[in-house]
């Protein structure tokens, strides 16, 4: 196996032969996915960094990697010993990709990026920036790794399965008609869907092509009278074939989508989402003389609002997940006191308990178990090299979730394993206050998550602290654990919040090399009231699991905070207790007992 330095040397040989001064490796695949199958993990292969977000850039004399605050510490560790320089996004003084390339390369240089895995919006922005940074040009039609990546994993070929109506809540025919109505409103004749979760949702199908994401690799072309699924036929079972045939959906090979788009259309308007569609496929559509209409896909907004069946599924999935979490938390402290547990063993125990639950289909992301200083690595993942023993003191941060056939879960709990410091208690309480403030929010229908973000941060800001990751994201219904368009974060996000959306509430605080705290519930946005000022919304927790009360400094909580926590814990006990045995029920009763101020 080649080392990172050997891979860089081989890449530079290819770059010289192609007269390229720099090459850019994004994190995405041909579908602009956040999490990608091994075939498309080019950035990881060339850099060694395995986080879900980041961009590697290699010039003939240097190499750099950009990533966000979730991965700063992990990236420092993974890039150590290589020539890569870590570029911290949103940190003052960090150059942009194009600025750094301009520092490294001569004016007029040619820069490469694989246009099959780079969205049209991204490449157009890069072209403009590189022109501005010294008249550099961007080449899109070349992937150097085809020459140097030996034994590259193939595009996955796992079987596709039906997602029954009893869990989907809406027929595929109904979804197709809703999408076609959007095409009519936008005066378009067709639409190419690239996003894998959008395709899975539209067709009520699921797959296992991407780790932890129940999707399959395909494209979907919709026209007013015709629907074509571009997918390798080996993935289609007899059952799925009959299902698609009944919907009059034609199947063509996955690798023929570009060829199909190049057909000589006449007076054909095709809708493409510039943020989801690769530059290569946009070029194919233009080569076919179609009139390309660049618009945001209507599907994410449709998918984001869960129907009654999906909401019921979330409640049921969260209940089963809560049972697994309670059993894990009951086991945790005694097991740690015995002295044989590590971060990896905690991960395995929690996964094993989830596997016992009905309709379990796998994890929704790789579990994060960060003990003490590892808790400060926002997206830490223990492995044989980093795994450490868990001691009966300090804090452990556990961020985990599962895929059930009727819903997807995402939960974080930070647990005191024994004595902790006053600073740890103070920060834990500040994070909890922010979590509560956001979950108690009442707000007008249609505002953006940006307008709510301050509620989760305000207690930390007041104390001079902050976290740099987002506060909340949408969650799919047996789909991707990160789902848009709704988000709660500091950066402006125009997507409006509406009843029926899911969103997480996950403020945190991380002190490098010391500890981290994060508390996360998955919430459902619901109608609250309607006044002369319009419709108002509120949020209710779908997650059912005790929040550790041991680290709380009660004097820092308001009466409203205390009432919220006690009400939440009463709900957790009432909902889960009947699913537990006697010992588990007693443990839960103690874990959810009301907190109160000390009497004077």
Q: What residues fall within each predicted segment?
A:
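Active-site neighborhoods and metal-handling regions in enzymes and metal-associated proteins
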Residues: 1-600
């Amino acid at each position: 196996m080649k080392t990172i330095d050997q891979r860089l040397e081989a890449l530079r040989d290819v770059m010289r032969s192609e007269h390229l001064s720099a090459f850019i490796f994004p994190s995405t695949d041909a579908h602009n996915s956040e999490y990608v199958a091994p075939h498309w993990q080019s950035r990881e292969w060339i850099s060694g960094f395995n986080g879900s977000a980041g961009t590697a850039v290699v010039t003939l004399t240097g190499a750099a990697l950009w990533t966000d605050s979730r991965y700063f510490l992990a990236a420092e560790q993974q890039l150590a010993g290589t020539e890569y320089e870590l570029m911290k996004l949103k940190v003052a003084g960090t150059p942009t990709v194009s600025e750094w390339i301009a520092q490294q390369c001569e004016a007029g240089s040619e820069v490469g990026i694989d246009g099959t895995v780079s969205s049209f919006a991204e490449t157009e922005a890069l072209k403009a920036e590189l022109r501005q940074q010294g008249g550099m040009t961007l080449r899109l039609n070349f992937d150097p790794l085809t020459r140097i990546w030996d034994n590259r994993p193939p595009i996955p070929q796992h079987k596709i399965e039906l997602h029954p109506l009893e869990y989907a809540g809406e027929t595929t025919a109904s979804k197709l008609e809703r999408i076609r109505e959007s095409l009519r409103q936008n005066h378009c004749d067709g639409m190419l869907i690239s996003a894998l979760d959008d395709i899975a949702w539209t067709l009520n199908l699921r797959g296992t092509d991407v780790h932890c994401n129940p999707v399959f690799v395909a494209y979907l072309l919709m026209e007013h009278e015709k629907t074509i699924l571009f997918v390798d036929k080996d993935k289609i079972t007899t059952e799925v074939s009959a299902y698609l045939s009944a919907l009059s959906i034609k199947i063509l090979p996955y690798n023929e989508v570009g060829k199909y788009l190049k057909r000589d259309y006449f007076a054909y308007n095709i809708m493409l989402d510039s943020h989801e569609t690769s530059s290569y496929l946009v070029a194919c559509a233009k080569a076919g003389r179609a009139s390309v209409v660049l618009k945001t896909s209507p599907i994410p907004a449709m998918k984001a609002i869960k129907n009654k069946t999906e909401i019921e599924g979330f409640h049921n999935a969260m209940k089963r997940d809560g049972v697994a979490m309670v059993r894990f938390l009951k086991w945790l402290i005694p097991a740690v006191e015995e002295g044989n547990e590590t971060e990896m063993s905690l991960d395995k125990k929690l996964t094993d308990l989830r596997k016992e639950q009905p309709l379990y289909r796998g994890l929704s992301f790789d579990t994060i178990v960060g003990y003490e200083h590892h808790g400060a690595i926002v997206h830490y993942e223990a492995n044989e090299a980093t795994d450490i023993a868990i001691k009966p003191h300090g804090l452990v941060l556990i961020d985990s979730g599962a895929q059930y056939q009727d819903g997807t879960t995402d939960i974080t709990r930070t647990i005191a394993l024994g004595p902790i410091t006053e600073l740890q208690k103070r920060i834990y309480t500040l994070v909890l206050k922010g979590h509560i403030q956001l979950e108690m929010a009442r707000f007008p229908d249609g505002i953006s998550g940006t307008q709510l973000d301050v509620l989760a941060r305000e207690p930390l800001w007041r104390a001079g602290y902050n976290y740099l990751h987002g506060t909340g994201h949408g969650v799919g219904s047996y789909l991707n654990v990160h789902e848009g368009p709704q988000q709660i974060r500091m950066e402006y996000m125009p997507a409006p919040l509406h009843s029926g959306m899911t969103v997480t509430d996950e403020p945190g605080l991380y002190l490098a090399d010391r500890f981290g705290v994060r508390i996360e519930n998955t919430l459902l946005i619901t109608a609250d009231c309607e006044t002369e000022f319009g419709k108002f919304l509120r949020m209710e927790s779908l997650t059912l699991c005790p929040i550790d009360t041991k680290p709380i400094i009660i004097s820092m909580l308001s009466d409203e905070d205390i009432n919220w926590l006690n009400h939440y814990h009463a709900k957790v006990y009432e909902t889960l207790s009947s699913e537990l045995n006697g010992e588990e029920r007693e443990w839960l009763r103690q874990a959810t007992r009301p907190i109160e101020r000390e009497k004077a």
